[in-house]
Amino acid sequence: MNELIFLVEEALEGGYVARALGQSIFTEAETLEELRAHVRDAVKCHFDADKAPQIIRLHFVRQEVLTN
């Protein structure tokens, strides 16, 4: 695997949550800096060193509701 994509969203209680697409990896943190570190650590724990993705992409998703 060359690349792994995480969907990142703001948590309702504050902070951020990230989940990997196609893998059972989930992590959360209070700040984006902490989240980046947690994502790297979670990927290291999930994959053997020779099978870890070379690229980790964070895709930020933000939802807004507009009403009239």
Task: Specify the residue positions occupied by each region the protein language model found.
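Short, charged, surface-exposed hinge/linker loops at domain edges
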Residues: M1-I5, E33-N68
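Short secondary-structure boundary micro-motifs
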Residues: M1-N2, E9-A11, A29
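Structural detector for hydrophobic anchor residues on beta-strands
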Residues: L4, Y16, I25-T27
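Short aromatic-glycine-(Arg/Gly/Cys) micro-motifs in beta-strand/loop hairpins
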Residues: V8-A20
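Residue-level signal for pocket-adjacent positions within structured domains
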Residues: A20-L21, K51
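A short, exposed loop/beta-hairpin motif centered on an aromatic-Gly-Thr core
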Residues: Q23-E33
